[in-house]
């Protein structure tokens, strides 16, 4: 599936977008026995500390996130989400230490992490777009760090993608962020 006419096609997998194909999926054996896992829902939406829908709700007048952003960063037309992204630096992030803690202290039997939130910011070195953690913010492949840490700890890894709202996620920003 080409993203653009001259672009490299996206990788395809064993499934097609229909129910019959999805029914052929077999749940991994480890998952049947795993009773507890940790999901790290962490990315640039955490910069402000106001919640995971920050990139959308910071543009919705009257919401807590809108008011929080105005108070701490100024008007959204002058400092929008694109300006928040470079503040996501992950300078104190230690995936080995965190995953070890999740397993040994919390009892996690698997680890999931966020690959891309509704904000369309890829947490890996994406070949399909420049809005990713290698080009903006931490300059690190966050997914690779989590994957290596999970493997080192012997935990199965899952990655979640939240593209369901991607097409309409930034609609509230159109009145503010003109760049």
Task: Name what the model sees in each region.
Residues 1-179:
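Mature catalytic domains of secreted/periplasmic carbohydrate-active enzymes
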